[in-house]
Swiss-Prot record:
Major site of localization recorded for this protein: secreted
Protein name: Serine carboxypeptidase-like 37
Disulphide bonds in the chain: 120-368, 280-291, 315-336
Single Gene Ontology MF annotation: serine-type carboxypeptidase activity
Name of the gene encoding the protein in the UniProt record: SCPL37
One Pfam entry name: Peptidase_S10
Organism: Arabidopsis thaliana
Gene3D superfamilies referenced in this protein's UniProt entry, alphabetically: 3.40.50.11320, 6.10.250.940, alpha/beta hydrolase (3.40.50.1820)
Keywords: Carboxypeptidase, Disulfide bond, Glycoprotein, Hydrolase, Protease, Secreted, Signal
Length: 487
């Protein structure tokens, strides 16, 4: 009797297991078919009773650029691009493009780069100057820049202020106030961006950080550095130094050097200079009509010049070529390269790849927002940066100011005059420095960790005109080593 009961129990258990396995098998087939159907995408509404769980990507992971359209092979470093909000509630968004160092480690510094303007895109800095790629003449393919600054650092390119490049605001009030509060608002937005970006990329919080830029970034860079210093007790940022090229620092001193530069480079006559001095500068002989005529005569000579590099050719035909030019090299400046970049960044495929223009802005990407540039506060433009530079140096922040020697917009002599206005003690006298045995320019060191550097054969955008010199200057600065003083 007991054996019969045991057999009955055993039979029931086996029968239960058999039925359960059949149910599981059928269920598995059903699920498999659903998955297969969803992959095939027959266009019909699917069965929503089955949901595949997916891991939610972090903002950093979403910003990862898998590959740039037209990117050459052999790229080993990671790239990111995306938007970071800079106010609450979020209406202002700054766009960034970030390239990790080619050979990164946990101590590789972070460099933040700004172009000037005001309101010129730092993507110009990325793809025309110091980034890892340049754009071919067809506006579709890229080629490598072997002298990219990510040979030495992780480089973050920030499009600032808002409405520059892909950066935007959804609040019209922001745009109305920006022209009036340009410098102050921009510095605040840049700081908030950095704080929010470091939350997205926390591995860089303890890194050495440098801020760099050119032209009107002579305002952006010191002003952002000043905010960092003022707020470092609350949120520590390991700011080590600032590097500014051909910078706007003090217009009252720098502006008059333009005509002197033209005269010394054979771009105007001595008589034209004498007329200008007589009718425009002397109170006893000032004549408004004659002054205006004098200025017009001189300025007419600029029409056929690239004032950012007086020895560079000008772009005569920016028509994109179907076949990219052969033997393209960063050592040859193509005067139409801005047009190639504009065509490249306005391709929908490119914007999707770099996570830009996600809100479908009603205008195309341009290298500068000319409307904002023209409406920028004159008071801001004329504000001297000397007091901020003194403050930063007093806090132990190293400063390097470099200037191309063929820039008419901000001549090197005008920048040197600003440095002299700072009344610093010279530690090492004006002397030559070299790259590969060739003269790279001249340099002078001052007490308080300020270095001034001229760059031979470079204009307003030093990394474009002299990429090897620019990389050597940058490397020297972040390694805190002197530029080579022997050939």
């Amino acid at each position: 009797m007991v054996k019969q009961q045991d057999w009955s129990v055993t039979t029931c258990v086996l029968l239960f297991l058999f039925l359960a396995s059949q149910i599981h098998c059928r269920s598995g087939i059903h699920v498999s078919k659903r998955l297969e159907g969803s992959k095939q995408g027959d266009g019909k509404s699917g069965d929503t009773s089955f949901n595949v769980l997916r891991r939610v990507l972090s903002p950093k992971e979403k910003d990862l650029i898998k590959k740039l359209p037209g990117q050459p092979s052999g790229v080993s470093f990671r790239q990111y691009g995306g938007y970071v909000p800079v106010n609450e509630p979020s209406s202002r968004f700054l766009y960034y493009y970030f390239v990790e160092a080619i050979k990164p480690n946990t101590s590789t510094p972070l460099v933040i780069w700004f172009n000037g303007g005001p309101a010129c895109s730092s993507l110009g800095g990325a793809f025309l100057e110091l980034g890892p790629f340049r754009v071919h003449s067809g506006g579709r393919k890229l080629f490598r820049n072997p002298y990219s600054w990510n040979n030495e650092a992780n480089v973050l390119f920030l499009e600032s202020p808002v409405t520059t490049g892909f950066s935007y605001s959804s609040n019209p009030i922001d745009l109305e106030e920006l022209g009036e509060k340009g410098d102050k608002a921009t510095a605040e937005d840049n700081y908030i961006f950095l704080m929010n970006w470091l939350e997205r990329f926390p591995e860089y919080k303890g890194r050495d950080i440098y801020i760099a830029g050119q032209s009107y970034a002579g305002h952006y860079v010191p002003q952002l550095a000043q905010i960092i210093i003022h707020r470092n007790k609350k949120t520590l940022v390991n700011l080590r130094g600032i590097l500014i090229g051909n910078p706007s620092l003090l217009t009252s001193i720098q502006d008059p050097y333009g005509y002197e530069f033209m005269l010394s480079h054979g771009l105007m006559s001595q008589q034209q200079m004498d007329n200008y001095n007589q009718f425009c500068l002397r109170d006893d002989l000032y004549d408004n009509d004659k002054c205006a005529l004098s200025v017009k005569t001189i300025d007419d000579a600029k029409k056929h010049l690239d004032t950012y590099n007086i020895y560079a050719p000008v772009c005569l035909n920016s028509t994109l070529s179907r076949i990219s030019k052969k033997c393209t090299t960063v050592l040859e400046v193509d005067p139409c390269s801005k047009d190639y970049l504009k065509a490249y960044l306005n391709r929908k495929k490119v914007q999707k790849a770099i996570h830009a223009n996600t809100t479908k802005l009603p205008y195309e990407w341009t290298s500068c927002n000319n409307e904002l540039t023209e409406n920028w506060s004159e008071n801001d433009r004329d504000t001297p940066m000397i007091p901020i530079l003194h403050e930063l140096m007093g806090e132990g922040v190293r400063v390097m100011i470099y200037n191309g020697d063929v820039d008419l917009e901000i001549p090197f002599a005008s920048t040197l005059a600003v440095v002299k206005e700072m009344n610093l003690t010279v530690v090492k006298e004006f002397r030559p420095w070299f790259t590969g045995g060739q003269l790279g320019g001249f340099t002078e060191d001052y007490k308080g960790n300020l270095t001034f550097v001229t760059v031979k054969g470079a204009g307003h955008s030093v990394p474009t005109d002299q990429p090897i010199h620019a990389l050597n200057i940058f490397t020297s600065f972040i390694r805190n080593t002197p530029l080579p003083h022997t050939a």
